[in-house]
Design a protein with these regions (language model features):
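Extended terminal and domain-junction accessory segments
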Residues: 1-118, 156-157, 161-163, 167-184
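Short amphipathic alpha-helical segments, especially helix-boundary/capping motifs
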Residues: 38-40, 127-130
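Extracellular beta-rich ligand/substrate-recognition surface
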Residues: 43-45, 134-136, 144-147
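Beta-strand-rich interaction surfaces with strong enrichment in secreted/lumenal proteins
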Residues: 51-54, 140-144
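Tight coil/turn sites that cap or link beta-strands
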Residues: 59, 147-148
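The feature marks short-to-medium sequence segments in extracytoplasmic or secretory-pathway proteins
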Residues: 112, 119-129
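Short beta-strand and strand-turn-strand segments in soluble, beta-rich domains
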Residues: 128-138
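Short strand-edge motifs at loop-to-beta-strand transitions and within beta-strands
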Residues: 141-143, 149-155
């Protein structure tokens, strides 16, 4: 069979920040290593748990801020410098802070739009070498959060109530606890 893509894809409407019930106070989720465990806001996986911060109302739109605050366990730095895995310019390399790793964050049950990607806390050299590969337009269900990066996303919680998971899509991180429930 012959198949051709349409000349123009169907338009989509992004969610407006002004439609969020928490536009001025987004929920904050920090992804980091703490006490040798991959955590979200200091918590690890509990199969039937969702904290107040992880509880949303049906038929609402919210903004969440996802923060990759790096390692925490071994101090500052990063993979590329300041004592990080690759060492600094004058340091000769080393294993420093291997815990500052990218986290591809996947949120089940919803799709979202990316409102803002704050890279001000990232190493500028690293960001400038990778920024062309990021696609922030359209609907997403997973977003890559680099070390030092903050991302604001907006999503609508509709159709279903229940417990749904959100997690880092690095299997080792997910298996070590970087997965949580949110409740609608």
């Amino acid at each position: 069979d012959d198949f051709a893509l349409p000349a123009q894809l169907a338009p989509f409407n992004m969610l407006a920040a002004s439609s969020a019930i928490n536009e001025q106070n987004p929920r904050n989720f920090k992804f980091f290593m703490e006490r040798m465990k991959w955590t979200i806001n200091g918590n690890t996986w509990e199969p039937r748990e969702a904290t107040d911060r992880e509880t949303v109302k049906l038929d609402t739109t919210e903004i969440w801020e996802l923060v990759n605050s790096g390692g925490g366990m071994m101090g500052g730095g990063g993979m590329m410098g300041n004592g990080g895995m690759m060492g600094g310019k004058d340091e000769g390399g080393g294993m420093g802070n291997m815990m500052q790793m990218p986290h591809p964050i996947h949120i089940h049950q919803v799709q979202f739009n990316i409102l803002e990607r704050d890279t001000s806390a990232m190493d500028a050299t690293v960001w400038n070498s990778i920024k062309e590969g990021f696609i922030d337009g359209g609907w997403q269900d997973t977003v890559l959060v680099m070390p030092g990066m903050k991302i604001k996303i907006i999503m609508r919680f509709e159709d279903f109530k229940g417990l749904f998971v959100y997690h880092c899509h690095n299997l080792e991180h997910e298996d070590m606890g970087m997965m949580r429930n949110y409740s609608i």
